[in-house]
Amino acid sequence: MTLLNPYFGKFGGMYVPQILMPALYQLEKNFVDAKKDSNFQKSFFNYLKNYAGRPTPLTLCNNLTNGTKTRIYLKREDLLHGGAHKTNQVLGQAMLAVKMKKKEIIAETGAGQHGVAAAIASALFNLKCKIYMGYKDIKRQSPNVFRMKLMGAEVVSVESGSGTLKDACNEALRDWSRNYQKSHYMIGTAAGPHPYPTIVKEFQKMIGEEAKKQILEQENRLPDAIIACVGGGSNAIGIFSDFIDEDVNLIGVEPAGQGIETGKHGAPLNHGRTGIYFGMKSHLMQSQEGQIEKSWSISAGLDFPSVGPEHSWLNSIHRAKYVSITDIEALEAFQILSKKEGIIPALESSHALAYALKLMYLDPKKEQVFIVNLSGRGDKDIFTVREILKKTEKKHESL
C-alpha cells in the first residue's frame, strides 16, 4: 500500500513491472520521512539558497510591453545555477538518493537541461551518473552534452525509436529495473509512476511560492494569469502550485510544432487520448491502434508524447487551460525577448512567452498582469536557432 494518494483524479498510478514496486515504495517512504525531517528540509533550502542561487528574481519587461497596458513579468529560472528550473528538484532527489544509500544516478534528458542538472547534483553529492539521451537530441544539444561529460556523467546515446526523449525515458527505465538496488532513477519532470509526480512538484513548488510573494510586493495584487510551457510539465506545476486555490488563470502552453493539422506536434492534452505510458495514466499521443505516436517540437525539452498526470487532472476539471504555440511563433518570441530585453530565453520558455505576447496583442488597451515562467536560458539553443535563421535567409534570397 502507498503512503500517499498515487492519483490526481483518475490520472497517475504506478503502472510498472512488479520488480520495480519495492523501489517505488522505498522512494515514497524516504520522501515522506524527508518531508517531516527538519534537518533534511533545512539542508535542502540551504543548497537552494547558497548553491543554486534562490530566490530567483521576478523581472518586469518594460520594453516588451511598451505602448500597451499589459505588464509581463518573467520568473527568472534562467538565472538559476545550471541555467534552468531543473536544478531545484535534482538537489532534492540527490539528497533522497544519499538518504537511501544509492551509489548511482540514472536519468533521461531531452534538451539536456535535466541531464546537466543531474550531472551537477551527482557531482555535488559524489554519485556516479549515467544519462540516457536520444541521438537526435545529442546532435541538437551538443553544448549540454559536453557540460554533462565535463561534470563526470556518462552520456548514453539512444538509437532506438525516434531517438528523442520518449526513447531515452524507456531506456532509463530498463536500466533502473536491472539496477534499482544500487541506483536511483532521477526523473526530470512531473511525470512517471507515483511517487515521482508528487516528489517533483514538492521540489519545484518554491517557484510559485516566490512568484506569489514577489508579485504582491511589486503589484500589490495577484496576476491575471500565470503562463508556463508544458512538456512533461514540471516548471508549470512548480509555478502553478501556489496559485491553484487563487482566482488566477493558469495557462499551460504545449508545442504545436509545425502545426496541429500536420500531426507534427507535442500537444497531448488537447490532441491526445488517455492511456498508459511511462508508468502512469495520462494524456498521450496515440494512433488509432493505441501505439505511441512521435511528438514534434523545435524545442527538445517539449518533444514528449505525454504529460504529467496532475496537468491531465487540472485540464479535466477546467482549473487550468492548455493551449499550443507553433515552432515559428516560439522562434519569433525567442528573438523578440532577446532584442527588446537583452534576455535570451530557452526555446521551451519561448512557447510560454509567445502566448503571453499573443494575449497582449489581442487587446493592447486592456490592463492586465501576466507572469511568464522563464524556465531556462537559451544558450543551449543558439546554434539551433542560428541554423534555422540561416535557412530562412537563404529561402528569402532565392525568392
UniProtKB/Swiss-Prot annotation:
EC number per UniProt: 4.2.1.20
InterPro entries assigned to the protein according to its UniProt record, in alphabetical order: Trp_synth_b_CS, Trp_synth_beta, Trp_synth_beta/beta-like, TrpB-like_PALP, TrpB-like_PALP_sf
UniProt catalytic activity: (1S,2R)-1-C-(indol-3-yl)glycerol 3-phosphate + L-serine = D-glyceraldehyde 3-phosphate + L-tryptophan + H2O
UniProt keyword terms in alphabetical order: Amino-acid biosynthesis, Aromatic amino acid biosynthesis, Lyase, Pyridoxal phosphate, Tryptophan biosynthesis
Cofactor annotation: pyridoxal 5'-phosphate
Pfam families given in the database record: PALP
PTM sites of type N6-(pyridoxal phosphate)lysine: 86
Gene Ontology terms, MF aspect: tryptophan synthase activity
Signal peptide (UniProt feature, chain positions): none
Pathway: Amino-acid biosynthesis; L-tryptophan biosynthesis; L-tryptophan from chorismate: step 5/5
GO cellular component terms listed in the entry, alphabetical order: cytoplasm
Self-association state and partner proteins as the record states: Tetramer of two alpha and two beta chains.
Role according to the record: The beta subunit is responsible for the synthesis of L-tryptophan from indole and L-serine.
Family: Belongs to the TrpB family.
Name of the molecule in the record: Tryptophan synthase beta chain
Organism, as annotated: Buchnera aphidicola subsp. Schizaphis graminum (strain Sg)
